[in-house]
């Protein structure tokens, strides 16, 4: 039997020659090279003196409320509100373009009957009739004239409790506030040469950018924050600030502090992040109507763009976390459309984008502080993916969308095909968007999120613009470079080879002929015949077998043997013959970890499904200990492994040990085992399903957990190559006699080959499904 290879590995993996150990130690010593660039790297700590810390820079961040400033005459910048804070009645502000607009604002106290008052406007004494009927609110009145010798007339008015007023030059107009607080709004006066209008303020004032107009309106209606109304806030001259807003440069390298050996550099960079999603769509075996998986996987993308006249080469890796698993089952027939699992990212998911470029900011990224980033959001809509069926209309997964919003940035290491890069990892939170997604020609519709079927929607990439800033500790001499503290490039190169080999192995599943597979599964494969397909010398094959045994020694299968060996000797005596469910705990101890039994044995709430699943996970070793003439799952697993090794073009001495060990653990994860007692069969799977039925009629009977536990201890355990559902389907559609049923129950390879040679679709579909489960 092909599974002999696993038993040989279990037996021989504990014997390692001393010379091999010495060689391995010597190899490890020679490959672990430590580079000592100085005392800081040697101790793995940064220098104690980090410099002055954060440096304030008022040219980058614009304040919302700038001031207060003393009364003055000046030309305010365009698109900035002057928020006036008068204290006494009278003229508060005036401005003119000296051509066709003279505009001033007068403050009138509450409860003033109509009377004539004298005001000084633009250097002249003017008589104006004013009034304020409100008992509590102050009144601000705009007065205007269009010629130098004309008369002033009253225009818009504002009744205000906070006693605040605003005026702004913008878009060929002069804007002011009017109405009544707390519902005041803006109005305007058209003015030529508006940008040259000088304003004279007779009270303290603040300056607020147009982008914060909503905040200015809030102050007009409700008053300034309390902190602005204390004696600690002292107005200063307008000359103390520069109104001109200086934009940050796309590339900024600023020396924060410097000593003889080290300096702190602040790197500010405008960046363009381009990324794409990758996916994996795996079709199940059978007649072509079923898919086992539609999932996301990490995607690398390399590109160039221009920043401040300089061409930048960048590399990104996009990955997702917190995916949601969905499935669709159109029925139990072989021709029913089924997707066992398809992944969707939603609000509870995260998207990570690792970014690197070839600028100085990424050269010495060992000690970093003050890392910050500001990125735009981006919407990612899903496309249409058609599931090609052999016959009939294709189901189409269509729609779905999410938006990515920046949620933070950290340091990371990004692995390309050949080198590891110090990178920035940008984390994005998600929000679902319209439209919803659906699977056309099925009942799946109205679901939200982005499915993995076609996440890029025929676009080459998505793009996000933004900026990051960090302070990095680097050598004062720019010719020096600090090394990566723990280099993992060699291991990552092996991981890359393993990743490519896994992909190749998984793609080879559809090229395996089932009749040849069964013949190969019946051969007593040993290590030499297993690896004979690899083009190498005998010495290399011997070394390869030794490396495989060393790796296999640490596998989950090998680790389970010692635990099982200790408990098997006590299994029979520890079984209680009581019919209660609780008594199963002592029997299960032979097939479960001791720690699991200790927590489960006293829990009456354990369901039958949980108990059978716990036992069935350990039945693989029980089956190995009581080998039968029937075919088992490990025979198929080893035969598939042998076939793929022979077909592979990328297998080598470095990757083979990992592949063999992974295959022993991951091939055929969903296994079903059975025991036979007279005319009754008890069957349990690793996912918790269980059946009990009669051999002749396939009629289900109640599942007796205690009986199953007893039979597991005393009787041979058989791999259910053809499980109960397949047997029942075969009997219902074709009809089988008792002898055929018994042969299939015992997994007789001759009978299996006969059904496959007859091209029986039900048996072929089951075997193909097992082959497709042989994935890494």
Curated annotation (Swiss-Prot):
Presence of keyword Transmembrane: no
UniProt short sequence motif KID motif, positions renumbered to this chain: 644-646
Positions of region (Spike body and stalk (antigen domain)): 248-479
Gene3D superfamilies documented for this protein: 1.20.5.170, 2.60.120.200
Disulfide-linked positions: 203-216, 318-380
Top-level lineage group: Viruses
Annotated segments matching region Spike foot: 510-776
Sequence motif YGL motif, residues: 448-450
Annotated region (Spike head), positions in chain: 65-224
Something else known: In group A rotaviruses, VP4 defines the P serotype. Some rotavirus strains are neuraminidase-sensitive and require sialic acid to attach to the cell surface. Some rotavirus strains are integrin-dependent. Some rotavirus strains depend on ganglioside for their entry into the host cell. Hsp70 also seems to be involved in the entry of some strains.
Protein name: Outer capsid protein VP4
Organism: Rotavirus A (isolate RVA/Cow/Thailand/A5/1988/G8P6[1]) (RV-A)
The organism's taxonomic lineage, starting at the top: Viruses, Riboviria, Orthornavirae, Duplornaviricota, Resentoviricetes
